Amino acid sequence: MAASRTATRTLRALRTSTRPALTAAPRAAFRQGGRRLYSSEPAKSGGSNIWAWAIGAGALGAGGLWYLNQDGASATPKVFAPKFDDYQAVYNEIASRLEEKDDYDDGSYGPVLVRLAWHASGTYDKETGTGGSNGATMRFAPESDHGANAGLKAARDFLEPVKAKFPWITYSDLWILGGVCAIQEMLGPQIPYRPGRQDRDAAGCTPDGRLPDASQAQDHLRNIFYRMGFNDQEIVALSGAHALGRCHADRSGFDGPWTFSPTVLTNDYYKLLLDEKWQWKKWNGPKQYEDKKTKSLMMLPADMALIQDKKFKQWVEKYAADNELFFKDFSNVIVKLFELGVPFAENSERWVFKTVNA
């Protein structure tokens, strides 16, 4: 834990003033185990003030609330339309919790917050216009029980105290803001964000099978991502998120991290794909690869498909050679993913939040 935190702070100190140009060195060490938080009770709010949704996000552009300040028998309604500073405050709270709560994989909840935002968005289907980040329907079964979403309760629970402190923000906007914050605080590129997502009930749950299956190859990847409206270059750029986090045998069945610095976003994922020698892992789990040198890293069949397919591989090579290009393309495509199917108000603007600990 201490080594992981020290390495992260060292990387932060070595940053240049131009964020996209950063090429972070791999961490010397990262925490292999530790207590994992899988569930927690939502924080309870108190006091005499009542927050109630009265105006939808579309009506006010960035959302709106009636704030009922009860004083005895009287109640004075006020319209609250959150602005940039309000969302920056939410961002700051998430960043603060990321710094304080180090009882998760490799000392950070950052990667699992990115995964939550990704999986909430990656259910979009352009033909039917269903799915996507608008709704936060993973709060409900059956979507919460989909195999691809195993372990994401930890991320949802991590954000519950933030929701309690800022009850005006929708879960849909909060989950995406959590992903944006995590990427930026893990030394990634700036990720423009705009609010306007509205929560839905269980009727909006998407069918199982819309998220990528890591055991599959390039044809499956194209079927999944083309359905959302992505091209080959965007598929490879989005895959760069695998620089973060690790797989768990009790969730996906796979096990291990992709990179030596799983809480720092760099282009190391692409470099390792090309530079390391990969072999099948001999174990009782599903088929996955391990690096021949240390046997401590893993790649999944869907990862290896990126260098087995010529059209994919050209982009792997470009991103491995140019971290700035990767950051630029990753930022563009993750914003596209996070906004799929969201009925934003006309002329709504994107914001870039100031980092707190990065």
UniProtKB/Swiss-Prot annotation:
Q: GO MF annotations for this entry?
A: cytochrome-c peroxidase activity; heme binding; metal ion binding; peroxidase activity
Positions that bind heme b: H242
Keywords from UniProt, A to Z, are:
Heme, Iron, Metal-binding, Mitochondrion, Oxidoreductase, Peroxidase, Transit peptide
Q: Report which reactions are catalysed by this protein.
A: 2 Fe(II)-[cytochrome c] + H2O2 + 2 H(+) = 2 Fe(III)-[cytochrome c] + 2 H2O
Q: Does the keyword Transit peptide apply?
A: yes
- Where does this protein reside within or beyond the cell? Mitochondrion matrix; Mitochondrion intermembrane space
The protein's required cofactor(s) are namely: heme b
- Indicate the residues that form the catalytic site: H119 (proton acceptor), W258 (tryptophan radical intermediate)
Q: Which family is it part of?
A: Belongs to the peroxidase family. Cytochrome c peroxidase subfamily.
**Biological role:** Destroys radicals which are normally produced within the cells and which are toxic to biological systems.
Any idea what this protein is called? Cytochrome c peroxidase, mitochondrial
Q: Which organism is it from?
A: Neurospora crassa (strain ATCC 24698 / 74-OR23-1A / CBS 708.71 / DSM 1257 / FGSC 987)
The upper taxonomy is: Eukaryota, Fungi, Dikarya, Ascomycota, Pezizomycotina
What gene is it encoded by? ccp-1
